[in-house]
Amino acid sequence: MDGEGFGELLQQAEQLAAETEGVTELPHVERNLQEIQQAGERLRSKTMTRTSQESANVKASVLLGSRGLDISHISQRLESLSAATTFEPLEPVKDTDIQGFLKNEKDNALLSAIEESRKRTFVMAEEYHRESMLVEWEQVKQRVLHTLLASGEDALDFTQESETSYISESGAPGRSSLDNVEMAYARQMYMYNEKVVSGHLQPSLVDLCTEAAERLDDKNVSDLWVMVKQMTDVPLIPASDTLKSRCSGQMQMAFVRQALNYLEQSYKNYTLISVFANLQQAQLGGVPGTYNLVRSFLNIRLPTPIPGLQDGEIEGYPVWALIYYCMRCGDLMAAQQVVNRAQHQLGDFKNCFQEYIHNKDRRLSPTTENKLRLHYRRAVRASTDPYKRAVYCIIGRCDVSDNHSEVADKTEDYLWLKLSQVCFEDEANSSPQDRLTLPQFQKQLFEDYGESHFAVNQQPYLYFQVLFLTAQFEAAIAFLFRLERTRCHAVHVALALFELKLLLKSTGQSAQLLSQEPGEPQGVRRLNFIRLLMLYTRKFEPTDPREALQYFYFLRNEKDNQGESMFLRCVSELVIESREFDMLLGKLEKDGSRKPGAIDKFTRDTKTIINKVASVAENKGLFEEAAKLYDLAKNPDKVLELTNKLLSPVVSQISAPQSNRERLKNMALAIAERYKSQGVSAEKSINSTFYLLLDLITFFDEYHAGHIDLSFDVIERLKLVPLSQDSVEERVAAFRNFSDEIRHNLSEILLATMNILFTQYKRLKGSGPTTLGRPQRVQEDKDSVLRSQARALITFAGMIPYRMSGDTNARLVQMEVLMN
């Protein structure tokens, strides 16, 4: 049966093939095995795609079906949804269709409100995004700057390496690098130093800076210096060093007292401004004083009664609010006036308050304080009157964890309230919640809250105020110095504290700008004052060296790690950087006298400073400047030593107007003439080398000018090289005594001398036939002498223990051969 099936199938296939071949219109399609395989793969992939899609649909149905969702139903719902009706245009209505008109107006109003809100939202988002980016960039910049300032001593040292030239190229003086604020401060520094140098009564640097700040017309800066003046107006406690003085309880109490006075006076001024700005609402009247001022202020601050206030009113004003704001303005007598008028409503508080205001340290006795604290915990802590709670916490110095944000809603109010609670006595019986020390408060502000809490990029002066009023002077200055726009203020605050001996300075120059040293009390930080000053002056040293000198004078008693005066070191670097040698150090007149410079005003020992600057210039390779400075300091040995180094490379050069050689030659001749007239001399070897170099300059000048006979006479008188066989050994022995400055020029001297001999020989040979005036025997003798002199030079060149440059020997031999 199977055989019949295959046979029938074969017969049908053959018949089909025959029919196909009979149709001539259709071409034959032939495929090889590879094409058949590719076609099969394509068919298979299509089948697999459909299968995988169906499989994915099945899996999705199973997943969503397990959660109770029907895919087909969801698809139908999605297809039925349309957003066309959300913002479709309003249909036109007839003029008489009131309902349709109102509906359209309502829809229009809604759509307009939505669109306006959308635009406003996008604008706000853009502004927030931009502000956020600016803040982030500012933070990054400050971190980078802080990293640079806090790194090693040479972190910001961009000084270029000294060039190989012997004289520095100083550019033309440019415009001042100081802006108007920096220049205003610089003028005050000049006035201050003038008084100090002249020995007059030393003025207050704080007062001078305050005057400068008032002329700047910047309220933030003016307030800053008013605060600095207030905080520094404390009696200096006798102590062996600033650290002991600053950490003494008496000094810290004085700082807190001054900070409270400043905050109270500032708030009273704020109250006055608020009242006079709203006279109609304030209804100011009555006897001038704090009490009536506070009453008027409450008309603005509390225009409507606040629920929860306790213990009644006085003349329509809450009792505790009156007491609090009188205390906040620093007028305890006005607060006592309120307490006396409301004594029947306040119970025993009157006695506690009287004891508080009559104590110079604003402190209750331990018995009264414990009694008040107990009453606070039992009855007042749960009170709904925020002013009452605040007054009790201030007088009893208790519950220090409560920030009283209802009444102390500003940073200054918070500072005043917490500083009022600071205690200095060791209270063994006090619980931690009733004890706040100044170091604890300092740590809370600087470490726990920090810069991020106070938004320092928007309000840098506020954070400075927070740190400064809590006696964290060094941290406040270091923060303000990091901001470019406030850097000059930070530097001058540091100078003011430094002069008042209130600044804690770093003990090492390599310390960070703000650092803590081991073994010192926690929270004590030191400022690298020297680094601070040098970083500030670096900006304007090249353009304003006189102003920089005024600042460096503050370092006159400071020493570096090697014990050297920082004033001396800074002046040296300043002179080298600015190239203002004559202006700063003085100028040497033609008669040898010295014209004073800017440095003479600050010290009598100018010679030491000039020698130091000259040494620095010499180490940097600035030999010409160093020689002039040593000349200014009356140090002839160094003057001639450096001049010899300068002259040696240019001795054999051809002189040209305004060339390096011409300038050095004139300088050396001026020195030689002045020293000769004044009888000044240096060490014998240096002196002889100097004058020998001058003679060699004369020799080469004559030689290059073509004056053969004159140049020969010069070299013959110098007796530097032998001109006869008899003097060769003598000259070789003398060569050992010559300095390197002479030896380096020996090759050129020998070549020039040999060239002179060869020129004379050629001139002799080209002078024509023998005449009666010049017998042949004389000419032959002259030839013999020239050849003998040339041979002596060759012998000398071979005997000296010195390796001459290049092909000197070959050239000497060549010219000597030509003469034979």
Curated annotation (Swiss-Prot):
Membrane topology: Peripheral membrane protein
GO BP: nuclear pore complex assembly; poly(A)+ mRNA export from nucleus; protein import into nucleus
Molecular function terms from GO: structural constituent of nuclear pore
Cited function: Plays a role in the nuclear pore complex (NPC) assembly and/or maintenance.
Localization terms from the record: Nucleus membrane; Nucleus, Nuclear pore complex
Keyword tags: Membrane, mRNA transport, Nuclear pore complex, Nucleus, Protein transport, Translocation, Transport
Family indicated by similarity: Belongs to the nucleoporin interacting component (NIC) family.
Gene: nup93
Species this chain originates from: Xenopus laevis
Listed name of the protein: Nuclear pore complex protein Nup93
Pfam family, one: Nic96
Domain of life per record: Eukaryota
UniProt xrefs under InterPro entries: Nucleoporin_int_Nup93/Nic96
GO cellular component annotations of the record: cytosol; nuclear membrane; nuclear periphery; nuclear pore
Entry coiled-coil feature ranges: none
Main location: nucleus
